[in-house]
Structure formats: C-alpha cells, structure tokens
C-alpha cells in the first residue's frame, strides 16, 4: 500500500524496506534507532503510517502537477517545516514551471525545496564557464570594481585571486552569461554573497 501511494515521490523498493526506512527517517528526523526504541512496544505502526500518508497527501495538494523531478525530494523534512502553512498552489505551480524552464537551474529537483525555503543553494545555479570568466577578467583588466571604488592600493588581481559574480543577481532575473559576468576579488565576492 505504501509503495502504491508514494512510488512517484519516494525512491526505494518495498522489497528491501527502503520505503519504511524513508518514512522512519522522515518522522524521526534521521534518528531512526531512537524512534524505534521508544515505540518498540506500540501495538501497531499507525502513527508512522498516518504521518507517511499525510506527507504524501500534502505534497499532492501543494504541488498538484506531478513531475518526475519530485521523486526523491526530502518531502518529510519539508512537510515538518512547511506543512502547516497554506499556499497558493497556482502561484507555486507558476513559479515551479518557470524554474523548470530556466537553463541556469541545474538541479531541477531542488526547485521544490527552493520555492518553499527561498534558499538558492537547492537550485545549483549554473556557474560561469572558464571562457566567460576570462572574458570578464580581460574586459576589466583584472581590476575589482569594488576595490577601485573604495580607493584601495591594490585593485588589480591575478585571475586566480578573483571569482565570477552575476552583475544582476540571478534572483532578480540576471542570467549566467558573459554580459552579466564580473570578476571580483575573493573578499568582495564573499561580502556581496553574504548580503
């Protein structure tokens, strides 16, 4: 029953009890042995079965358009963190569809955690190519624009002392393209990323 319910959303085989392990990991937040030990005398696994069904039902209601990228997402963790919130599913679907079509998003599976958390790390935004970095470095003549603006003594850096940065951030519509690439010294790139 669990396999039929969740086969599109969870990796694993029911024969090797991987679905059970996934459900236990979700409900126990990874502390399976402690969860099992505390419930070893329970007459049944209704708590676990109810939780598992609730997670899958929440996924289906929150993201009604199924895509193969949904399989294997850590839905249990997302359910525990965001399952109590009400979402505009049409707006979520519009966002998911746009991100699925975005070539800069290399982790399509990460779209689902991203639309709930807002954390870009899940998307694995495409990095600038070596050629794009070199072109930006040459165009800037190795000068970090932030160092120059601050009037620092050292404004020119070797290419291996610099990192590529989106001039217009990806979240504001900036593309991972040569035109949107600038080279910053490591210090300024890290400072800019922390904002």
Which positions does each model-derived feature cover?
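A near-ubiquitous, low-amplitude feature marking generic local secondary-structure context
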Residues: 42, 119, 127, 164-168
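General structural signal for secondary-structure boundaries
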Residues: 1, 43, 129-130, 195
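Short, charged surface segments at domain edges that flank catalytic/cofactor-binding sites
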Residues: 105-152
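Histidine-centered nuclease catalytic patch
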Residues: 130, 136, 148-184, 195
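Solvent-exposed functional surfaces
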Residues: 1-119
């Amino acid at each position: 029953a669990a396999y039929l319910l969740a086969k599109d959303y969870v990796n694993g085989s029911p024969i090797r009890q991987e679905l059970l392990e996934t459900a236990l990991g979700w409900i126990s937040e990874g502390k399976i042995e402690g969860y099992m030990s505390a419930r070893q005398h329970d007459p049944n696994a209704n708590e676990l079965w109810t939780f598992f069904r609730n997670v899958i039902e929440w996924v289906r209601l929150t993201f009604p358009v199924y895509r193969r990228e949904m399989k294997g997402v850590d839905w249990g963790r997302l359910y525990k963190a965001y399952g109590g919130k009400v979402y505009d599913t049409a707006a979520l679907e519009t966002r998911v569809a746009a991100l699925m079509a975005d070539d800069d998003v290399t982790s399509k599976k990460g779209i689902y955690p991203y639309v709930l958390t807002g954390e870009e790390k899940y998307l694995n935004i495409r990095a600038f190519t070596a050629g794009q970095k070199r072109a930006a470095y040459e165009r800037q003549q190795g000068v970090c624009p932030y160092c120059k603006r601050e009037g620092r003594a050292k404004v020119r850096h070797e290419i291996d002392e610099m990192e590529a940065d989106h001039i217009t951030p990806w979240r504001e519509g900036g593309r991972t393209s040569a035109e949107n690439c600038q080279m910053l010294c490591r210090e300024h790139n890290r400072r800019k990323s922390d904002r």
